[in-house]
Amino acid sequence: MPPIPSEPENISLIHPKVLLLSAGVTTSLFLSYKFYKRYVRRIRNYLDLTPEILDRQTPLYGRVTRVGDGDNFRFYHTPGGILFGWGWLRHVPTKRQELKDETLMVRLCGVDAPERAHWGKPAQPYSEEALAWLKNYIFGRNVVVTPYSIDQYKRLVGRAQVWKWTGKKDISAEMLRNGLGVVYEGKIGAEFGDNESWYRKLEARAKWLRRGLWSLGSSMTTPGEFKKVHYRGDS
């Protein structure tokens, strides 16, 4: 005679097995969401930068899509890089209309480049050289940005690094090393990370070697002084 099937076990919602399974599913969903937020979700523009990202200084990986000035650039966030398909499954847009509202404006920390001509104001010596150098150094390249803050112009102020044959390079440091900027002089919104002392040593060496704008000697004006005269009406 075939065995008589047993009655199905009635398990209540508070049974240890149910509670254990629920806890496991909940934990998995929570960890998946945290992983998505930190490593997968793309930061489209400054509105997506949460206080948590800035407080933790979460590194952001991406591509430089435009260089418009000597100390800032447009950055398209590519979370996870090549491991998450960027460059072979997912591609960075190149057309302006595709990039609209999809990039971060990054302001290099710790450095101030010579001012270009704006709104009828004159250009500062070495402003075009600084812009040309920065374009050649990072345009179209992948960089990593350590975010520090958002300034009054909705720019992300942070440390940007780019990979070269000789290793990872701090872009602010390289500008100072080549005399294409000075250590940032502003009192409001100044960000250096832990590198202010290093930046000042690089600036001092460039000045001693008369590199870039330091070759102007006594006629050299810092970007901060230049802006006071030409942009704030001070004489």
Curated annotation (Swiss-Prot):
Domain of life: Eukaryota
MF annotations from Gene Ontology: endonuclease activity; metal ion binding
Sorted UniProt keywords: Calcium, Endonuclease, Hydrolase, Membrane, Metal-binding, Mitochondrion, Nuclease, Transmembrane, Transmembrane helix
Active site positions, chain numbering: 107, 115, 155
Residues annotated as transmembrane: 11-33
UniProt-annotated binding residues for Ca(2+): 112
Domain TNase-like, residue spans: 58-216
Classification via InterPro entries: SNase_OB-fold_sf, Staphylococal_nuclease_OB-fold
EC numbers on record: 3.1.-.-
Topological type in the membrane: Single-pass membrane protein
Presence of keyword Nuclease: yes
Compartment(s): Mitochondrion; Membrane
Disulfide bonds: none
UniProt cross-references to SUPFAM superfamilies, sorted A to Z: Staphylococcal nuclease
GO cellular component, one term: mitochondrion
Gene3D superfamilies: 2.40.50.90
Keyword Membrane: yes
SMART domains per record: SNc
Chief localisation class: mitochondrion
Family note: Belongs to the LCL3 family.
Protein name: Probable endonuclease LCL3
Organism: Debaryomyces hansenii (strain ATCC 36239 / CBS 767 / BCRC 21394 / JCM 1990 / NBRC 0083 / IGC 2968)
Higher taxonomy: Eukaryota, Fungi, Dikarya, Ascomycota, Saccharomycotina
Gene name for this UniProt entry: LCL3
